[in-house]
Amino acid sequence: MSSLKAEFVVSSGKPDTFPSDRLPEIAFLGRSNVGKSSLINALTGHKKLAFTSNTPGRTQTINFYRVDEKFYLVDLPGYGYARVPAGFAEQWKVLIEHYLEFRETLKFSCLILDTRRGWMEKDLDLKRWLDHHGRPYLVVATKTDKLNQSEQERGLRAIRQEGVEPLPFSALSGRGVREIWQAITTTLQAR
């Protein structure tokens, strides 16, 4: 896939600093270090657009990336593991909840799971919240390249047990990029 025109716009720690241009937004949600930033980089064709790290909890604000001047990809802080004081973790939680509940320009979310780990309680809580509020989302199963074929199938089968069809993704091979874009563009065209 060729690179899209994509640019970092703002890193927001408060709702009043979110972009105000009313472009539609696609949110990337998941545990810390699950591959949200790597997925954004793969989707845009820019290896260093979104900062990636092997250290969980590096994304500590909501990061907005404008794509082709038409919409935003939004990288949210990961939930779960992060070496930060409890007060910061609570601030992230409040910020994320506010974004998901009140952001009118949020049109679609990618709920990202590590295929090796499957569903954790906080993932299930988020899935239930999205279902309850009628928010459209796609479950993306990352890190498939770290598993052999039978391990991949076992991980994907475990994810399917919650009644969703995960879309496998690999940052190394690009597996799943086209299908994820198809889901995003279908949603954007419908709204």
Curated annotation (Swiss-Prot):
Disulfide bonds: none annotated. Its cofactor is Mg(2+). Residues 22-190 form the EngB-type G domain. It comes from the Bacteria. Signal peptide: none annotated. Mg(2+) binds at S37, T59. GTP binds at residues 30-37, 57-61, 75-78, 142-145, 169-171. It holds the Pfam family MMR_HSR1. One of its GO terms (biological process) is division septum assembly. Belongs to the TRAFAC class TrmE-Era-EngA-EngB-Septin-like GTPase superfamily. EngB GTPase family. Necessary for normal cell division and for the maintenance of normal septation. This is Probable GTP-binding protein EngB. It comes from Solibacter usitatus (strain Ellin6076). The gene is engB.
